[in-house]
Amino acid sequence: MTGRILLLNGPNLNMLGLREPEIYGHATLDDVVELVRARAEHHGLEVDAVQSNHEGDLIDALHRARGTHLGCVLNPGGLTHTSVSLLDAVKASELPTVEVHISNPHARESFRHHSYISPVAAAVIAGAGVDGYGFAVDILANNHLQRTASQ
């Protein structure tokens, strides 16, 4: 299989390994990108990784990926709970998107329980630590194989 996936990480995820390690663990963003690239390579896929603390940058990355990528692994960070614009960009991209959260938002403060992204996500992985990113790649690869086999 060949193709590209977009790895998109939102606000504060550049601080992984430093910010609240008791919640998010000690893995860094570089560790996450390496994990995703290794898992994607196993499936014959390439990865374009983007992290931004700015909502518009994430939206632009989704727009650019439309028609060129087979899916998106998205950890929207705090934008999960606030961003209708990011929701609209996920929809406009027409990419199968797996929403990933390192911690389980439902086991945390009540304001974290709502996700604007989940209703349009192909899958949601929460509470699996950084391993959730690898699971997301597996889901996108398997879904792509199923779609191409049925065409």
Curated annotation (Swiss-Prot):
Annotated TM spans? none
Q: Where is this site: Transition state stabilizer?
A: 19
Q: Which positions are catalytic residues?
A: 24, 101
Transport in keyword set: no
EC top class, as a word? lyase
The record's listing under PROSITE patterns reads: DEHYDROQUINASE_II
Which reaction is this enzyme known to catalyze? Answer: 3-dehydroquinate = 3-dehydroshikimate + H2O
- GO BP: any one term: chorismate biosynthetic process
Protein's pathway: Metabolic intermediate biosynthesis; chorismate biosynthesis; chorismate from D-erythrose 4-phosphate and phosphoenolpyruvate: step 3/7
What residues does substrate bind to? 75, 81, 88, 102-103, 112
Q: Name one GO molecular function term.
A: 3-dehydroquinate dehydratase activity
Keywords recorded for this protein, A-Z: Amino-acid biosynthesis, Aromatic amino acid biosynthesis, Lyase
Question: Which Pfam families is this protein grouped with?
Answer: DHquinase_II
- Give the EC number(s) listed in the UniProt record: 4.2.1.10
Name the protein family: Belongs to the type-II 3-dehydroquinase family.
Name the PANTHER family on file: CATABOLIC 3-DEHYDROQUINASE
Oligomer status and interactors: Homododecamer.
Q: What does it do?
A: Catalyzes a trans-dehydration via an enolate intermediate.
User: What is this protein identified as?
Assistant: 3-dehydroquinate dehydratase 1
**What's the source species for this entry?**
Corynebacterium efficiens (strain DSM 44549 / YS-314 / AJ 12310 / JCM 11189 / NBRC 100395)
